[in-house]
Amino acid sequence: MTTVIQRRSTSNVWEQFCEWVTSTDNRLYIGWFGVLMIPTLLTATTCFIIAFIGAPPVDIDGIREPVSGSLLYGNNIITGAVVPSSAAIGLHFYPIWEAASLDEWLYNGGPYQLIVLHFLIGVFCYMGREWELSYRLGMRPWIAVAYSAPVAAATAVFLIYPIGQGSFSDGMPLGISGTFNFMLVFQAEHNILMHPFHQLGVAGVFGGALFSAMHGSLVTSSLIRETSEEESQNLGYKFGQEEETYNIVAAHGYFGRLIFQYASFNNSRSLHFFLAAWPVIGIWFTALGISIMAFNLNGFNFNQSIVDSNGRVVGTWADVLNRANLGMEVMHERNAHNFPLDLAAVEVAPAVRG
């Protein structure tokens, strides 16, 4: 008779779950942040799809004039959007159970809050998951730091700006044309083009695109040939190979002669840090600028700052921007008020003299 003695498993279900969640052997890493990220992003995505297709019109301005945003109510992919919550709701937390009925919740734009708040929690957790996986693999945390730039930008337009303006109705609509409308209104009310933080963001995005194109083209132009003329040079690279796949000395020499010597990096590590840091810092500044303008600390205003010897205004580009801002503000919420605040603040003579 043979007796087989097996060691009793000491791990319970919770320990097995913890091991599975934190295991780096999974095809997709879950992580503790992923435990919260997955349901929140699924909720936001599901609600967005349903609302984009079939949500009824929303009384965004709080004046009983609903605005349609879904496909089934006359929009297409370009004009469709999830319309922000009503100005009548303001900054109040507005879950489904706070409304008297589902129809009221939809009429006041409840789906917008549901989507935005779940989405922000989800992207915060995605950033934490990036750090968590880097930690498990013994990597440095800069991937999560870089991702913090778009997270900060999304937080600025979806949360900080509505808080500063006093209502979720001022948040960015969830759609293509809604995004452009948000940009135009933001320019009209805050003169963002004349804000130095936005200008730093433009330099970061366009500069990052330029540097990325320059780096990619230099590397591609200085590959070390490992193949014949009839084969693609891409076949000369083997995943995980120890030797360099391109000649950094040749790329450095080319670029140094094209511009000047010190414009070219001779250190691959500092080069790639620069490529990551430039756009990230620029987008950080943009998010910070939007957060500042949310509380009406706006861009520079040089309106009528130059006059000639006779006191006549010498028109500048700033004056062109100011006129454009007034025009855009007149078009914005045209049924809520007849004139922008700049014009409505002018003292008007009484219509009836007593």
Swiss-Prot record:
Matching Gene3D superfamilies: Photosystem II protein D1-like
InterPro entries: D1/D2, Photo_II_D1/D2_sf, Photo_RC_L/M, Photo_RC_L/M_CS, PSII_D1
Binding site for a quinone: H215, S264, F265
Cofactor note: The D1/D2 heterodimer binds P680, chlorophylls that are the primary electron donor of PSII, and subsequent electron acceptors. It shares a non-heme iron and each subunit binds pheophytin, quinone, additional chlorophylls, carotenoids and lipids. D1 provides most of the ligands for the Mn4-Ca-O5 cluster of the oxygen-evolving complex (OEC). There is also a Cl(-1) ion associated with D1 and D2, which is required for oxygen evolution. The PSII complex binds additional chlorophylls, carotenoids and specific lipids.
Documented EC number(s): 1.10.3.9
Entry keyword set: Calcium, Chlorophyll, Chromophore, Electron transport, Herbicide resistance, Iron, Magnesium, Manganese, Membrane, Metal-binding, Oxidoreductase, Photosynthesis, Photosystem II, Thylakoid, Transmembrane, Transmembrane helix, Transport
Residues noted as binding chlorophyll a ChlzD1 in the record, renumbered to the chain: H118
Catalytic activity, as annotated: 2 a plastoquinone + 4 hnu + 2 H2O = 2 a plastoquinol + O2
Broad class of the protein's primary localization: membrane
Membrane topology of the entry: Multi-pass membrane protein
Disulfide bonds: none
A Pfam family of this chain: Photo_RC
Post-translational modification: Tyr-161 forms a radical intermediate that is referred to as redox-active TyrZ, YZ or Y-Z.
Binding-site list for chlorophyll a PD1: H198
Annotated site location: Cleavage: A344, A345
Site (Tyrosine radical intermediate): residue numbering on this chain: Y161
Other noteworthy facts: Cyanobacteria usually contain more than 2 copies of the psbA gene.
Protein name from the UniProt record: Photosystem II protein D1 3
Name of encoding gene: psbA3
